[in-house]
């Protein structure tokens, strides 16, 4: 009797499921954008109705990205996690679980924040762990950083780019100029040597290496797998490790990423 490789078949089933879910749901955001009151509609629909839709799952529904972020948090143990681009709060509860002290999330659209707060209440999250800030992330993040002790380790998840707004360059400049120990994960990033991952661009400007400031000192790490092994939106992710963070952890032990280049 031929032996069945259980791991292989479980992998095949998971790939099939991811493919079917992605095909069935990738058009939903486009359809919603054509509705004048799309977010009014979302408020009236129970969140459980969207369990198979990537944009209401943590980190765009990308399971390998979640594993990488969880592994980073386990090794790095950040006191504070800062998210820019709360949207409706689909990633915030997950990111809050990675912080030993406080989770701070920044959103520029009041409409999205209202929906996010409803989401947090529904989940029964305690308010003292999550601080919600309304405003331009490129402005508010500077205020937030000025109140955090320099010795605190911070994990950032930057996803505030939306429509024609791209505050990423300003966010990164503020973070790197502050210095200290930090790790930054950038969503929707163009992977320079792997075109299988999607990425975003705004007014002709792509989210790529060109937005990383010269003031950054550290290393850039990228996914060590193709988008075929990712779920959800399958967008690229960049991970920036500051020099101090590199001295505190062994990055080569982090799941799912590879060294791309040094920045100095």
Where are these regions (language model features)?
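A short alpha-helical cap/connector motif
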Residues: 2-155, 160-264
């Amino acid at each position: 009797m031929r032996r069945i490789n259980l791991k292989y078949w479980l992998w095949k089933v998971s790939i099939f499921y991811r493919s079917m879910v992605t095909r069935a749901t990738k058009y939903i955001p486009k359809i919603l954008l054509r509705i004048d009151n799309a977010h009014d509609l979302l408020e009236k629909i129970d969140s459980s109705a969207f369990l198979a839709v990537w944009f209401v799952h943590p980190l765009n529904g990308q399971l390998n990205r979640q594993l990488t972020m969880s592994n980073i948090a386990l090794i790095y143990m950040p006191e504070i996690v800062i998210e820019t681009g709360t949207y409706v709060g689909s990633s915030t509860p997950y990111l809050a679980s990675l912080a030993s002290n406080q989770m701070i999330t920044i959103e520029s659209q009041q409409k999205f924040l209202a929906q996010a707060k409803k989401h947090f209440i529904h989940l029964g999250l305690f308010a003292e762990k999550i601080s919600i800030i309304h405003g331009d992330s490129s402005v508010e993040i500077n205020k937030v950083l000025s109140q955090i002790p320099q010795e605190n380790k911070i994990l950032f998840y930057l996803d505030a780019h939306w429509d024609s707004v791209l505050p990423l360059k300003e966010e990164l400049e503020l973070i790197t100029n502050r210095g200290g120990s930090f790790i930054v994960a950038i969503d929707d990033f163009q992977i320079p040597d792997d075109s299988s991952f999607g990425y975003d661009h705004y007014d002709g400007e792509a989210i790529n290496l060109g937005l990383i400031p010269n003031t950054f000192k550290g290393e850039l790490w990228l996914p060590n797998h193709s988008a075929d092994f990712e779920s959800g939106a399958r967008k690229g992710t960049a991970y920036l490790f500051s020099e101090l963070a590199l001295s505190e952890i062994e990055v080569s032990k982090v799941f799912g990423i590879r060294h791309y280049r040094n920045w100095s």
